[in-house]
């Protein structure tokens, strides 16, 4: 059970003054060259990402966020970025998550859509982001709801909430019932069911 009073106390104690001076634009080649063989991405995201040449880097405590953009107008308002970081820090502090996170936020404008009749469910229908529990990198693939997706991906790193020990029978049942293309989409299904 979540203690909302404790959550509010943590939230109110977090100061964002240190973040204000840690916004800087850098060259993309310094950060990451490309999304190679990404099974969670789709063609349009890769095209958008490859056309991004600049990155807005924002740092605080144990979080670095890189916003990949084509035009400065694509960058979310500073107030929204600060609020998102405060919310993420609240979750990290509340659940005592010890990870140093590196976010790659690709500001692709495509929206989620449901598959057409007889179309197989795929990442472009579900994914807003992804992470690996064994790494500290989190990828956010859509401008749409980026802040909610960032928080959602951090929650995957909370051992009290996330369990990746699906049995083979559970995975096969989910794949059959939801017409999933392959087993890599089990995390996508988790996203679909939890949002």
Ranges and model annotations:
Residues 1-24:
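Intrinsically disordered, low-structural-confidence terminal and linker regions
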Residues 27-136, 143:
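Auxiliary, metal-adjacent structural segments of Zn-dependent hydrolase domains
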Residues 71-78, 140-149, 181-192:
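Short, charged/polar micro-motifs that form catalytic or ligand-binding hotspots
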Residues 83, 87, 149-153, 193:
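Acidic, Ser/Thr-rich intrinsically disordered and amphipathic helical segments
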Residues 103-105, 152, 156, 174-180:
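Structural signal for hydrophobic/aromatic residues that build the beta-strand cores
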Residues 113-115, 158-159, 166-168:
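Short catalytic/ligand-binding loop motif for oxyanion handling, primarily in non-cytosolic enzymes
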Residues 148-163:
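Active-site recognition of the HExxH zinc-binding catalytic motif
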Residues 162-163, 167-195:
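Post-HExxH zinc-binding segment in Zn-dependent metallohydrolases
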């Amino acid at each position: 059970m979540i203690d909302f009073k404790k959550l509010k106390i943590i939230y109110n104690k977090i100061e964002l003054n240190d973040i204000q001076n840690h916004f800087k634009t850098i060259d993309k080649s310094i950060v990451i060259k490309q999304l190679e063989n990404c099974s969670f991405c789709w063609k349009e995201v890769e095209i958008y990402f490859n056309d991004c040449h600049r990155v807005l880097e924002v740092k605080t405590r144990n979080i670095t966020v890189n916003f990949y953009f084509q035009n400065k107008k694509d960058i979310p308002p500073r107030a929204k970025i600060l609020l998102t970081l405060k919310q993420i820090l609240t979750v990290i502090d509340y659940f005592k998550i010890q990870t140093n996170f590196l976010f790659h936020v690709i500001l692709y404008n495509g929206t989620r859509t449901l598959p057409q009749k007889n179309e197989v469910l795929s990442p472009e229908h579900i994914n807003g982001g992804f992470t690996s529990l064994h790494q500290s990198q989190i990828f956010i693939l859509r401008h749409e709801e980026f802040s909610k997706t960032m928080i959602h991906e951090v929650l995957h790193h909370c051992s009290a909430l996330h369990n990746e020990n699906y049995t083979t029978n559970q995975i096969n049942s989910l794949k059959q019932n939801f017409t999933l293309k392959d087993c890599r989409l089990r995390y996508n299904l988790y996203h679909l069911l939890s949002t």
